[in-house]
């Protein structure tokens, strides 16, 4: 995924010794609104996390904090303790273990977990989201006055594949 965030605000959270774990979130992401059962959701009191719900929306997918898959544990030990507890209780969602779920274990262990809301979020975690990103990447490359160019991008579209040339190649109901 790609995102824009306030680095000064993040640095202040990192310097706060009362905070142990930061869960990065966004709100109102269109694909999560359409498919809330595909995402993790955070129940909070202010910015403090009460619980994380994986694959089960809370109250309102339009406004509830959405886990974007970025977590900041201030120490490896905090992650290990939380993950070990999750594994020991064998808490799985659809047969899988999720870092999202391990935040509930961190809360139970007494770690102070807070959310950090990003300013803008772009996901390419599903095939259609990736194709949409590739389409716009191709457009910006072809736009002569745009600063983006595949030649300057080490993560550019693979040379052995052709990028999409129109939105019609996407499943428009998933955009």
Predicted regions and their residues:
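Terminal low-complexity segments of carbohydrate-biosynthetic enzymes
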Residues: 146-175
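Intrinsic disorder/low-complexity segments enriched in polar/small residues
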Residues: 16-18, 135, 170-172
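Catalytic-core segments of class I nucleotidyltransferases/pyrophosphorylases
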Residues: 47-122, 128-150
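Conserved beta-loop-beta/alpha segment of the NTase-like Rossmann-fold superfamily
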Residues: 1-44
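A diffuse structural propensity rather than consistent per-protein peaks
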Residues: 6, 98-99, 171
């Amino acid at each position: 995924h790609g995102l824009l965030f306030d680095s000064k605000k993040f640095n202040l959270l990192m310097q706060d010794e009362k905070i142990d774990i930061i869960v990065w979130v966004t709100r109102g992401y269109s694909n999560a609104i359409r498919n809330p059962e595909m995402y993790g959701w955070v129940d909070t009191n202010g910015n403090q996390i009460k619980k994380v719900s994986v694959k089960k929306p809370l109250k309102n997918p339009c406004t509830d904090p959405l886990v974007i898959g970025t977590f900041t544990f201030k120490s490896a030990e905090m992650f290990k303790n939380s993950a070990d507890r999750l594994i020991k209780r064998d808490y799985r969602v659809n047969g899988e273990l999720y870092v999202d779920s391990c935040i509930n274990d961190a809360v139970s262990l007494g770690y102070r977990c807070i959310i950090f809301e990003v300013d803008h979020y772009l996901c390419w975690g599903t095939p259609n989201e990736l194709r949409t990103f590739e389409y716009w990447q191709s457009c910006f490359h072809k736009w002569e006055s745009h600063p983006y160019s595949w030649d300057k991008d080490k993560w550019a579209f693979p040379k052995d594949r052709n990028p999409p040339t129109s939105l019609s190649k996407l499943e428009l109901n998933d955009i």
